[in-house]
Amino acid sequence: MNTAVTTANSEKAKALQAALAQIEKQFGKGTIMRLGEGEAIQDIQVVSTGSLGLDIALGVGGLPRGRVIEIYGPESSGKTTLTLQVIAEMQKQGGTCAFIDAEHALDTSYAQKLGVNLNEVLISQPDTGEQALEIVDSLVRSGAVDMIVVDSVAALTPRAEIEGEMGDQLPGLQARLMSQALRKLTATIKKTNCMVIFINQIRMKIGVMFGSPETTTGGNALKFYASVRLDIRRTGTIKKGDEAIGNETKVKVVKNKVSPPFKTAEFDILFGEGISREGEILDMGVNAKILDKSGAWYAYNGEKIGQGRDNAREFLRENSGLAVEIENKVRDSLGIALLPTAGGDAPEAKAAKAGKAKADKDGVIEA
């Protein structure tokens, strides 16, 4: 009986090898492989969102590259601000970014205040939804762009709708456009390691008795193809005296294919400045016991950095290197990806480079 089982297994192995050889001959080497070999398994490369709390909520330290991301929420909730912060973070890593401004409403001076280098950002203001998605497809296929933002799905108007009369009924046209585009884009996005962020708006479904009446525009395709979906909401207003200086914001990770979903993050968005990263570093640094808080004073490594949250936040803003050092210690304590330091590399990358340099010099790396 054992001989029969062995023979059957041997026949199956031969049949499998023949099938694999036929597939590789027809479609090219590397078309199919075992999951544990080659480059099939690799660490997820991420880009920080500009918010430490949101990076932690995402579970991997930021938004994953080579994936489709959807960010949606009500009007003036911080959707474009969040994506501009991600562009600024990608530029810090030396990445090339493109912004498809279908809404024709990008405020370039505000983007500059958030740290975006306008000279290094590609921008397009397309006339139709088809044109916008063709531009995205061309940029992704080039392999030279690291991140593309589409603002917004709701503004991707099909050509037939633009050329038709006002009031024409064209049901499902935008949903079909998005479905076709995402079918074409997904595989190329993965191969070129390009992150594509779609900003989306909220609509209300009529006649919903149970559950949430809210839905996003553009049909269901984006919900399926997106690896990460973020629901961003404004929860309150930050005031200095009687003057409003920012918004309190809450983000829920509604879908996450790279880590457990449904985690939330809360942070402040200050008008004209963007996400208050230093405030988050203070709060999480204290929680992780990396910063000491005694009364109103904040201290790091026994040295006082400010009395009161506002003063300590201002100190970290003026000393960005120290802020990155503290943030990386918080990230390390939580086991998520570290930020690049002033030299452009995360600490573990610097260590690897140092090891390689020593190997080149000595011919061997000491254990």
UniProtKB/Swiss-Prot annotation:
Gene3D superfamilies: P-loop containing nucleotide triphosphate hydrolases
Gene this protein is translated from: recA
Protein role: Can catalyze the hydrolysis of ATP in the presence of single-stranded DNA, the ATP-dependent uptake of single-stranded DNA by duplex DNA, and the ATP-dependent hybridization of homologous single-stranded DNAs. It interacts with LexA causing its activation and leading to its autocatalytic cleavage.
Binding site for ATP: 73-80
Record-stated family: Belongs to the RecA family.
Name of this chain's protein: Protein RecA
Main location: cytoplasm
Localization per record: Cytoplasm
GO BP, one annotated term: SOS response
Top-rank lineage group of the source organism: Bacteria
Keywords: ATP-binding, Cytoplasm, DNA damage, DNA recombination, DNA repair, DNA-binding, Nucleotide-binding, SOS response
Gene Ontology MF: a single term: single-stranded DNA binding
InterPro entries tied to this protein: AAA+_ATPase, DNA_recomb/repair_RecA, DNA_recomb/repair_RecA_CS, P-loop_NTPase, RecA-like_C, RecA-like_N, RecA_ATP-bd, RecA_C_sf
GO cellular component terms attached to this protein's record: cytosol
